[in-house]
Amino acid sequence: MLPARLACGLLCGLRRGPAPAAACYGPARWLLEGKCEVPIRQRASSLGRRVPPSSTATEDYAEGPDTEERFLFPEYVPERTPEEQVRELQELRELQQLQQEKERERLQQREERLQQKLRAGFRTLPVPEFPDASVPPSGIYCSGCGAELHCQHPGLPGYLPEEKFRDAAQAEGGPARTVCQRCWLLVHHGRALRLQVSRDQYLELVSAALRRPGPALVLYMVNLLDLPDALLPDLPKLVGPKQLIVLGNKVDLLPQDAPGYLKRLRKRLWDDCIRAGLVVAPGHQGPQYPAGDEPLEEIKNQNPSSRSRTVVKDVRLISAKTGYGVEEMISALQRSWRYRGDVYLVGTTNAGKSTLFNTLLESDYCTAKGSEAIDRATISPWPGTTLNLLKFPICNPTPYRMFKRQRRLQEDATKAEEDLSEEEQSQLNQLKKHGYIVGRVGRTFSYSREQDEVPFEFDADSLAFDMGSEPVVSVCKSTKQIELTPEDVKDAHWFYDTPGITKESCILNLLTEKEINTVLPTHSIIPRTFVLKPGMVLFLGGIARIDFLQGNQSAWFTVVASNFLPVHITSLDKADALYEKHAGHELLLVPMGGKERMAQFPPLVAEDITLKGGGKFEAVADIKFSSAGWVAVTPYSEGTLHLRGHTPEGTALTVHPPVLPYIVNVKGQRMKKSVAYKTKKPPSLVHNLKKHR
């Protein structure tokens, strides 16, 4: 494209035609009459000066000593009128537009040629442009949730839009590592789609997997925040005559209320297992009761003949997120279960099964190649993320592998935090922010692609005639995705992640995805303590309420729930008006959406509670509001407390012995002119690291 000034000059010259000759006087007249051509570049330099000897004026020209000095004058260019300037600019714009249109057409033709080449190389797939039940499923399962991929109906698990389904089928290797629309939205946008999957379908899928022939071990994962309702009442019927290990997950979220709190949590989990009708394995001591602490009456009076044949081999506390207790669990599985059969991970929704699946996938419990070939499961606080079975091959714990693993664990235990790399220290600091206790999960053996892709090439003739030559080993760098071959999985045993079983009367069934992210704790819980006297009310968001109706003295109420769920204290006579005004708004936060949301949300239902006080600084009971958390009640002195709890209609409110009986001690000083105490967060501890030097 021409510069504006140059283009304007050219147009101006073409429009005017030849310029008029300048008037010449004196001896210079004969130069013009003789058609003397003086170069333009010489005119400016010779203005008012004598013509240099090298100039070529005419063939007759001869300079003598008496020759008079000659002058040349520039041509006269008349000024342009405004109309001419406007016309020139308009012509210039038209020229520019013409050039832009030609450039645009050239680029468009180039793009069309490229698209034709791409379409020529694609395979066609008979998939309609809209969901259609006549299109058969792909036969390939989502690597995030395990559902079969299809484009039949958006409300069914494994759905992919038509374009994504076609692109996945046309990709190299097919849709083997593709995730469904639901997993994609969960991971990349934090959105969850409600699917048409009932609780009976979940139970049937899990029970069908557990009925498979052959020996199998069941790992039943419970959320410690759901105690004592973490165990399903029909668990023995679901598991059947199989060996069982109970894993108490999310222990990293609970603060230490007193020394020995982990032992008390483990004993509490043992009691719940026995109360659910499970049998302790022969030779196992079961729950250990400290001196003066006896088992519950319903456990002592339980008829052994009425119990099921489901045997509990062990109870362990772990954190699938921070890694606490995971290495010890792997060692126990390799010692006791070894390689006798498949292992199934079972539990309710939001217990953390997919997180443990991903942690074990990168540990010594999975084969080295399987860790590289299998995608991680989709993790989300939304209940029911996993919709089908996910699996990875279990590593056979041979004596050599167990020896190398044990030596690695011993070396890791001798390291201090300062000895770790910057990347490991950064990851460890992030885990400390998420939980109170942290454990490091490592890997002893790693897989390299060259183990399977190093061909042994040689020339037979050269070996026959030249004994000094060596075979040539060439390493072929491949960019293909690592995949398990039939030889890799021959006679292999698998670790299965099963879909979570939905709980009835759970408050999560009433909440939206944004509300669930607020209610479910994902970081270490900081207890919040308030001192209330009779006639006061505690609101836990807009989903729970406790009225202190009557009591001899004040009492401490310690909230153990998500740090993002607000707590509001008011008087009994103002409580109803406050809830009517602020429910669905910022003060109570959950539910969200104002009057329209509250019109769909069920009303709060009241239930009277009577508690008898015990020792000072020890809670007498926990008031649990489904999966939203609990409030530990600690009276000042012995006496009777009359309370009233409120929960949404259709959800469960339970009163049970305190999980953390000394939680009231985890508080700061009382705020001035307030019923609240300053919060205090206990320090985080790393389990398998050497102490600071």
UniProtKB/Swiss-Prot annotation:
Which molecular function terms from Gene Ontology are attached?
Answer: GTP binding
Indicate where this protein resides in the cell: Mitochondrion inner membrane
Among Gene3D superfamilies, the record links this protein to: P-loop containing nucleotide triphosphate hydrolases (3.40.50.300)
KO phenotype (gene knockout): Mice display mid-gestation lethality associated with a severe developmental defect of the embryo and trophoblast. Primary embryonic fibroblasts isolated from mutant 9.5 dpc embryos show deficient mitochondrial synthesis and a global defect of oxidative phosphorylation.
| Keywords assigned | Apoptosis, GTP-binding, Membrane, Mitochondrion, Mitochondrion inner membrane, Nucleotide-binding, Phosphoprotein
Annotated membrane topology: Peripheral membrane protein
Superkingdom of source: Eukaryota
Q: Which residues form the CP-type G domain?
A: 203-504
For this protein, the record's CDD domains field holds: YqeH
Region called Disordered, residue ranges? 43-67, 286-307
Q: Which residues carry this modification: Phosphotyrosine?
A: Y76
> What are its GO biological-process terms?
apoptotic process; mitochondrial ribosome assembly; mitochondrion organization
**Expressing tissues:** Expressed in tissues associated with high mitochondria content including testes, heart, liver, brain and thymus. Also expressed in various bone cell lines.
Q: Pfam families recorded for this chain?
A: MMR_HSR1 (PF01926), YqeH-like_C (PF21516)
User: Which cellular component, as a GO term, is one annotated location?
Assistant: matrix side of mitochondrial inner membrane
PROSITE patterns from the entry?
A: G_CP
Q: How does it assemble?
A: Homodimer or multimer. Interacts with mitochondrial complex I, DAP3, MRPL12 and MRPS27.
Q: Which family does it belong to?
A: Belongs to the TRAFAC class YlqF/YawG GTPase family. NOA1 subfamily.
Entry function: Involved in regulation of mitochondrial protein translation and respiration. Plays a role in mitochondria-mediated cell death. May act as a scaffolding protein or stabilizer of respiratory chain supercomplexes. Binds GTP.
Quote the protein name from its UniProt record. Answer: Nitric oxide-associated protein 1
Q: Which organism is it from?
A: Mus musculus (Mouse)
